[in-house]
Amino acid sequence: MADSTFLAPELSDTESMGEETVRFQELLLKASKELQQAQTARPDSTQIQPKPGFCVKTNSSEGKVFINICHSPSIPPPADVTEDELLQMLEEDQAGFRIPMSLGEPHAELDAKGQGCTAYDVAVNSNFYLRMQNSDFLRELVVTIAREGLEDKYGLQLNPEWRMLKYRSFLGSISQQNIRSQQRPRIQELGTLDASGSLGTCHGPERPHLNLWLEAPDLLLAEVDLPKLDGAQGLALEIGENRLVIGGPQQLYHLDATVPLRINSEASRAAFHRRRKQLMVSMPLLTASS
């Protein structure tokens, strides 16, 4: 990842940019206003009733904890990647794969022995749940992500060891949950700009299609289409505080995009999706006080 001081040419000088580049910047700045409004506005929500799936038991310093893994078609599915592709991402500590899930509030329950315990309901997409039923790998991954999500959200410290209940699909009663009913607006599909006026020439590197969207108020995601590549070998990625630079092997691709948001380059991660031939970039955003 590049330091922002390394990526600091004077892109603000419109006299040094071509007409297409200026249009490129104007589209981004216009979309930035929509994003800022989305960050400050309270998102619309809808109420869902998750369906039971399976229940796992673990514990914290305060006693037994049960996690009801539930599902709902209203939860968006994760990206369609194979287990081999996902395993490669995890082995390389990449953050190109996310499992959308809804983390419910804690509710007090009684276990099989009549002793007090705490239960949490965690909902994932119904179609993804069906896929997870046939995969021990996905099941363990979902439980791990759910446990870590509950720890972050509620300040818990849960035992990473857990076991799945054999004869109960949930503990207690599964409550309704509120989820965002609208996706946040995409910034801009930058690849829709006229390719004939792209930053390169017909004999130079191709500028790939770039898609950006705000996944959460503090997380910007990018997808870069690289159909001529079979993997990440030779691919160069540099991320500054407000800039994304990508270079391909044999000078096949070059992208130099200014983003009207402040990126935490140190925490950014990327993964190459072999089947879709896309580079997926996860970029946490800096707060105003950073």
UniProtKB/Swiss-Prot annotation:
Instruction: Provide the taxonomic classification.
Output: Eukaryota, Metazoa, Chordata, Craniata, Vertebrata
Question: What is the superkingdom listed in this entry's lineage?
Answer: Eukaryota
Localization per Swiss-Prot or TrEMBL: Nucleus
Which protein family is it in? Belongs to the PIH1 family.
Q: In chain numbering, where does the site feature Interacts with TELO2 fall? A: 57, 64, 113
What does the UniProt entry list as the effect of changing residue 64 to E? Abolishes binding to TELO2-phosphopeptide
Q: Which residues form the signal peptide?
A: none
Q: Which gene encodes it?
A: Pih1d1
* Description of its domains: The N-terminal region is required for binding to phosphorylated substrates while the C-terminal region binds to the other R2TP complex components.
State any GO BP term from the record.
Answer: epithelial cell differentiation
On this chain, the residues bearing Phosphoserine are 12, 16, 173
Q: What is this protein called?
A: PIH1 domain-containing protein 1
Annotated membrane-spanning segments are none
Q: Which GO terms describe its molecular function?
A: ATPase binding; histone binding; histone reader activity; phosphoprotein binding; protein kinase binding
Which consequence is recorded for altering residue 57 to E? Abolishes binding to TELO2-phosphopeptide
**How the protein assembles, per its UniProt entry?**
Component of the R2TP complex composed at least of RUVBL1, RUVBL2, RPAP3 and PIHD1. Component of the PAQosome complex which is responsible for the biogenesis of several protein complexes and which consists of R2TP complex members RUVBL1, RUVBL2, RPAP3 and PIH1D1, URI complex members PFDN2, PFDN6, PDRG1, UXT and URI1 as well as ASDURF, POLR2E and DNAAF10/WDR92. Interacts with phosphorylated TELO2. Mediates interaction of TELO2 with the R2TP complex. Interacts with phosphorylated ECD, EFTUD2/SNRP116, RPB1 and UBR5 and with RPB1 in a phosphorylation-independent manner.
Function, please? Involved in the assembly of C/D box small nucleolar ribonucleoprotein (snoRNP) particles. Recruits the SWI/SNF complex to the core promoter of rRNA genes and enhances pre-rRNA transcription. Mediates interaction of TELO2 with the R2TP complex which is necessary for the stability of MTOR and SMG1. Positively regulates the assembly and activity of the mTORC1 complex.
| Cellular component, GO annotation | cytoplasm; nucleolus; nucleus; pre-snoRNP complex; R2TP complex; RPAP3/R2TP/prefoldin-like complex
* Keywords, ordered alphabetically: Nucleus, Phosphoprotein, Transcription, Transcription regulation
